[in-house]
Regions:
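Beta-hairpin "wing" of winged helix-turn-helix
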Residues: 54-69, 143-161
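Short alpha-helical segments that sit at the start of domains
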Residues: 1-18, 82-108
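Short amphipathic alpha-helical interaction segments
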Residues: 39-53, 127-143, 148, 157
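General nucleic-acid-binding
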Residues: 36-75
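Alpha-helical linker/hinge and terminal dimerization helices associated
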Residues: 84-94, 173-184
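Basic, amphipathic "hinge/linker" alpha-helix immediately C-terminal to the N-terminal HTH DNA-binding motif
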Residues: 63-84, 159-173
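Short, locally clustered residues in the helix-turn-helix/winged-helix DNA-binding domain
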Residues: 11, 19-26, 39, 85, ...
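Short acidic, hydrophobic short linear motifs in intrinsically disordered regions
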Residues: 26-36, 117-126
Length: 184
């Protein structure tokens, strides 16, 4: 499986928070207004560019009275934001602290979707970033999205399975992924 077939802008950190901030705004926001979410300008611009390529946001460069970038959700972006807001309300706490806003949460949930359990080693074959995936899985476990079990066999095998709430969140991310890949 190629990375481009599996990863989207939602695979990066803070994408969920950016979409929800745009959804909650009364109208288009200026890129500068979103810097409190992703405080590095270049990272924010790259994230917004990838979201624009996927059809989630529109970016308009305005030159009056000075140059700035206006960001707004597309129709598909509004649909994904609605799905994300439902997922956000299921998990308690601020979006900045939630697993769904962390890097690789989206592909991990989609990988686990529809399976009885997934072995940690199998997750690492798709995403070979051990620290990142263990951090996300730990947060998901704390939030009640996944259950962690260790096998009773002779070797240590860490298994993760989705809880009923985790299955609903995974369905949300699968729906968003389908919208992005099929453009609607």
């Amino acid at each position: 499986m190629r990375e481009s077939d599996f990863f989207t802008s939602f695979s990066d950190r803070n994408t969920a928070a950016l979409v929800l901030a745009l959804y909650e705004a009364d109208g288009p926001l200026i890129m500068k207004d979103l810097q409190s979410i992703t405080n590095h300008t270049q990272t924010l611009r790259q994230r917004l560019d990838s979201m624009a390529e996927e059809g989630i946001v529109d970016l308009d460069v305005v030159f009056a009275p000075h140059k700035y970038v206006r960001v707004s959700l597309t129709e598909m972006g509004k649909e994904t934001a609605l799905l994300l807001s439902m997922a956000d309300t299921v998990i308690p706490g601020d979006i900045s602290d939630k697993s769904i806003n962390m890097r690789y949460a989206d592909p991990i949930l989609r990988l686990m979707r529809g399976k009885e359990y997934v072995i940690q080693k199998d997750i690492k074959t798709v995403m070979p970033y051990y620290n990142s995936i263990t951090k996300v899985l730990s947060r998901m476990e704390d939030e009640g999205l996944v259950l962690r079990t260790e096998s009773d066999e002779g070797y240590r095998e860490i298994r993760y399975s989705l809880t009923p709430v985790g299955k609903r969140i995974a369905d949300v991310f699968q729906t968003i992924y389908n919208k992005i890949c099929c453009k609607g």
